A protein has these predicted regions:
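Active-site-proximal substrate-binding groove within the catalytic cores of carbohydrate-active enzymes
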Residues: 3-62, 71-242
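Hydrophobic residues within beta-strands of alpha/beta enzymes
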Residues: 65-67
Length: 242
């Protein structure tokens, strides 16, 4: 994006105000007022940036592109002169992704909203744990049962989760692959920043452990990644069979 102007590039609410947002806190279900706000881009600018990313990846010989928001968040623009509904945006996103896929590039999306399933090669950060509401007795992988064998997916980055072992077991139960988020920089560089969630991302510090986890997982479950899930049963508290 070559420069950003709020009145030109930001999407609009129905009351004609520009869409200015704050990050959402999953712990207390409210806006994080101590964080920096950001503006929601107009739909056409989002699509143009995806196209630019695809062209840049092709220039460098990239095998594919990874998209953080498409497939995860779908927004409208209520600008009275150029109204774009969520349904219109969905159709335009799918058309663009179909074109990228037809060019031979692979596509990785986030979270896994169903409208992108036909054009997605891999989904990251798929929810494997449910809402966690105390009134629920159990979580059942309905979505994963429906799509397993058709598209590959993974839960959270294993090295960044609060409970690595729990996420690993959930991945096995839900037929998910493994996903890691790594960086070359030392974790100490993240101190006193807003990126402390990446403390576990240093490659040198974790490569041996992660390689061992991946090797065992691939050896024991690699042969079933492209098969359908035909049954899922809760045998006892904390014990399931897929």
């Amino acid at each position: 994006l070559n420069g950003f102007l709020v009145f030109r590039d930001a999407a609009t609410f129905a009351n004609e105000k520009r869409v200015k947002l704050l990050p959402f806190d999953k712990i207390y279900y409210g806006e994080q007022n101590d964080q920096n706000p950001y503006y929601l881009l107009k739909p056409e600018i989002i699509l143009q940036n995806v196209e630019n990313l695809s062209k840049a990846a092709d220039t460098y010989g990239g095998a594919g592109i990874s998209l953080r928001d498409i497939g995860y968040e779908l927004s409208a623009d209520y600008n009275q002169k150029q109204l774009v509904t969520r349904e219109n945006m969905k159709k335009e996103q799918v058309a663009l992704l179909n074109g990228i896929k037809a060019s031979g590039q692979k596509i990785m999306t986030n979270m896994g909203n169903d409208y992108t399933l036909g054009v997605t090669d891999f989904i990251t950060n798929m929810d494997l744990n449910g809402s966690g509401y105390t009134i629920l007795d159990a979580a059942v992988p309905f979505y994963q049962i429906a799509i397993h064998g058709y598209v590959n997916y993974a839960g959270e980055a294993l090295n960044l989760t609060a409970d690595c072992e729990e996420e690993l077991l959930k991945s096995a139960e839900y037929g998910a692959g493994l996903y890691f988020s790594l960086m070359d920089a030392d974790a100490t560089e993240l101190q006193n920043t807003k990126y402390t969630q990446y403390f576990g991302a240093n490659y040198e510090a974790s490569k041996d452990e992660l390689f061992a986890i991946y090797t065992r997982y691939q050896k024991e479950l690699g042969s079933v990644f492209h098969q359908r899930i035909v049954d899922h049963a809760i045998l006892d508290s904390g014990i399931t069979l897929t």
